[in-house]
Amino acid sequence: AAEPNPTYIAFSEKGNLYSVGAEEGKGGIASFTADFQPLNHVVEEGAPLCYVSVDDKRQLVYGANYHKGQVLVYQLESDGRLSFVDQDTHQGSGPHANQASPHTHYADLTPDQYLITCDLGTDSLHVYDVSEEGKLTLINQYQIAPGAGPRHLVFHPHYKTAYLINELNATIDVLFYDGM
């Protein structure tokens, strides 16, 4: 299997591999079988995605595009191929020199199956309801300390706690998560 300039990978429960990368001014997500045979490559003009995650329950794949400030949703077809479904583009900026525009850095599921994104450029977390078809509805936004630059979020496996890594001020926020 080959993906030019890969930056992040994720696996489905079936063992398919999804990789984000870029080639010749286009970025996207490539899909591969469990034995690493190429299935398809969904690309778009401009900067590549920086994060990919798989929602096996709804048969969706989520991507974060740092340079465009976007979260993207792809449908997982029965053979593992991807097709584009929906996207949301964040708005705003932050006080740090690296925060002139939105920079979506992470897109993954909460323990109760909502999609959450970290936006380094706007110092915010966005929470979305995701329909079975992959359509996004923004339902909440949480502001982090100005200039923090949220990058990645990890939920504790047993407690109602999430750990947020902030890149720009080199901190970790410990958040209480009681669901939506």
Residue ranges and their predicted role:
Residues A1, A34-N40, S78-D86, E133-N140, ...:
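Beta-strand initiation motifs
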Residues A1, Y18-F36:
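Beta-propeller domains
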Residues E3-E13, E45-K57, G92-Q113, I144-A162:
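Beta-rich, blade/repeat-based domains predominating
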Residues S19-E23, G63-Y66, T117-L120, L164-E167:
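Conserved beta-strand positions in repeat-built beta-propeller and related beta-rich domains
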Residues G25-I29, G69-L72, D123-L125, A170-I172:
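Structural signal for beta-propeller blades
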Residues F32-T33, Y74-Q75, D129, L175-F176:
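Structural recognition of the beta-propeller blade-terminating site
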Residues P38-Y106:
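Asp-box/WD-like beta-propeller blade repeats and closely related beta-sheet repeat scaffolds
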Residues L115-A170:
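Loop-centered beta-sheet repeat module
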